[in-house]
Curated annotation (Swiss-Prot):
Gene: BBOF1
UniProt organism field: Macaca fascicularis
Family annotation (InterPro entries): DUF4515 (IPR032777)
Record protein name field: Basal body-orientation factor 1
Major site of localization recorded for this protein: cytoplasm
Location in the cell: Cytoplasm, Cytoskeleton, Cilium basal body; Cytoplasm, Cytoskeleton, Flagellum axoneme
Amino acid sequence: MPSKGKDKKKGKSRGKDTKKLIKTDESVVDRAKANASLWEARLEITELSRIEYRDTSRTLAKSNEDLKKKQCKMEKDIMSVLSYLKKQDQEKDNMIEKLKQQLNETKEKAQEEKDKLEQKYTRQIDELEGQFHQKAKEIGMIHTELKAVRQFQRRKIQVERELDDLKENLRNTERIHQETLRRLESRFFEEKHRLKQEAEKKIIMLAERAHHEAVVQLNDAGRNVFKENVYLQKALAYHLKEAGGLQKNSQKLQESHALLLHQKEINDLLIKEKIMQLVQQRSQIQTLQKKVVNLETALGYMTKEFESEVLKLQQHAMIENQAGQVEIDKLQHLLQMKDREMNRVKKLAKNILDERTEVERFFLDALHQVKQQILISRKHYKQIAQAAFNLKMRAACAGRTEYPKIRTFDGREHSTNSVNQDLLEAEKWTHIEGNVDIGDLTWEQKEKVLRLLFAKMNGCPSRKYNQSSKPPVPDYVVSDSGETKEFGDESKLQDKIFITQQIPISDSSGKVVLPTIPKGPQESDTGTF
C-alpha cells in the first residue's frame, strides 16, 4: 500500500514539470519575435536617417563651395578698400600737420591778444574795485547811520514807555501820599481827642478819688497826692512823646511829598527835551532815507556793471582753468607716486623704531631696577648710621665715651655733617682705573654707566664731571620713616630717553644711591660716632 501511493505522487510531479517546460519555451519564442520586430524597426529608422544625412552633407558641401567663392571676392574688395583708406589717411596726416602749424600760429596770436585783454581788464577791474570800495564805504556809513537811527527809535520807544511808567508811578505815589496824609491827620486828631478825653476823665477821677481819700484818710493826704502827681507827670510825658513822633512822621511825609513834586517837575522837563530831540531826529531820518534811496539806486547800477565785468572775467578764467586742470592732473599723479614712496619710507621707519624700542625698554628696565636698588641701599645705610649714632650718644650719656659730632639725617641744605654727604661719596669715581669689572662698581656708578651707554647709543653728547667737581644734588631724599621724597619727575626722564623724541639725555647721577659706601675723606667722621 505504501509503495503505490508513492508512485502516484511521482507521476503527478512529472506532469507538472512538463507543463512548466512548455510554458517557458513559449515565452522565449515570444520574446525572440518581439526583439526581432524591434530591431527591424530600428534598422528602418537608421536607414532613413542615413539617407537624410547624405542629402544634408551634399547641400552643405555645395553651400561651402559658394561661401569660399564669396570669401575670395570679399578679400579682393577688402584689399582695394584698404589701399584706398591708406591713401586717404596719408592725405589726412598731411592736412593735420598743416592744421597744427596753423593752430600754433593762432595760439600765439591768441596768447598775445589774451595778454593785452588781461592788462586792459585788470586796469578796468582795479578802477571798478576802487569805485566799488568808495561806494561800499559810503553805504557802510549810511548803514551805520541807519543803525543809529533804528537804535534811537528803539531807545525812543523805551524812553516813552519809561516816561509813561514814571507818570503812572508819580500818580500812584501822589495818590498814596495824599491817602496816607489824610489817614495820618485823621488818626492824629482822633488820638489827640482821645488823649484829651482820657486826661480829663483821669483828672476828674483823680479829683474825686482825692476828695474821697481826703475825707477818709486825712493823715495820708499829702503822700497820696504826691504819688498821683508823679503818675500824672509820667502819663503826660508819654502822651507828649507820642505827639512828637506823630509830628516827625508828618514832617517826613511833607518832605517826601516835596521831593516827589520836584521829581515830577524834572520829569516834565525831560519829557519836553526828549520830544524836541525826537522832532529833530525825525527830520534827520527823512533826509537820511532820501540819501539811502539815491545811493541804493546808484549802487544797483554799479553792481550791474560790476557783475557784467565779473561774468566776462569768469569766462576767461574758466578757459584758463581748463588749461591748468591738465597740469593739475599731472601733478596729482606725481603726488600719488610721491605718497606711495613716502608710505614705503614710513613703513621702513616704523619697523626700525619698533626694533629700537625693544632695546630702549631693556635699558629703561635696567635703570629702573638700579634705582630701586639705590633706594633700598640708601635707606638701609641711613638706618645703620642712625642706629650707630644713637648707640654712641647713649654711651656718651652714660659717661663711657666722649660725645660724637652732631649728625643730621633729614637731608637739610646747610648741614655740615649730613648722611647725604656720605651717600654722595658713592657717586665719585675715586681709586678707579681702566679694565674695571662692573660688579666692583657701586650702584650709582652702574647707573652712570648705563646712562652713558644709552646716550652713546642714541648719539647724544653726555655730560662729564671731574673727580674734584661736586656731583649734582639728588632729586629725592630718603626720610627717617623710609619714605622717598622726590623732587623730580621720573616719568619726564624716561620720556626724554627715547631716541624717537630727539631729546638729549640729562645726567641725573644725583638720583643714584650706593648700598656700600667707599672709604673717602669723611671716613674719620663716620668712625667716631
